[in-house]
């Protein structure tokens, strides 16, 4: 596994469906109805039910964890939520496409990986990055 600056990580595609949102709500104790109730989501101006921001963030971090082989090697992770992932109530759900690239090599044995997560061709996370221990 190369961790040189410029290395592109293998792309990751994750499909989120409504049942994933319900399971995540139970695990996170975030039962905000915008994540499961269409009527509520639309009443607050959303186009439909949306994925939890933290679920989207977790999905995006998988690209780094799978690349490095040890989720514990991620020593820092951050992002801002740029736009929602709308999850329709159908068999297809929402497809989140994740790409990442090593952008900096630090002297302490870590590298910075910039991450992009996109839904419907548009980024959903802003400034997403992970600092990863590689040695």
Q: Can you say where each PLM-predicted feature lies in the sequence?
A:
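Catalytic strand-loop segment that frames the active site of acyl-thioester-processing enzymes
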Residues: 1-51
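Short loop/turn segments at connectors of secondary-structure elements within structured domains
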Residues: 51, 73, 107-109
């Amino acid at each position: 596994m190369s961790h040189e600056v410029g290395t592109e990580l293998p792309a990751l595609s994750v499909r989120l469906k409504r049942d994933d949102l319900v399971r995540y709500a139970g695990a996170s104790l975030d039962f905000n109805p915008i994540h499961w109730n269409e009527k509520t989501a639309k009443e607050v101006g959303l186009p439909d039910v949306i994925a939890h921001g933290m679920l989207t963030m977790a999905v995006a971090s998988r690209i780094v964890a799978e690349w490095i082989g040890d989720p514990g090697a991620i020593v820092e992770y951050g992002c801002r939520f740029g736009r929602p992932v709308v999850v329709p109530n159908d068999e297809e759900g929402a497809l989140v496409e994740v790409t990442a690239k090593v952008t900096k090599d630090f002297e302490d044995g870590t590298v910075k990986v910039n991450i992009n997560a996109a839904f419907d061709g548009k980024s959903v996370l802003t400034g997403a990055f992970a600092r990863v221990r590689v040695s």
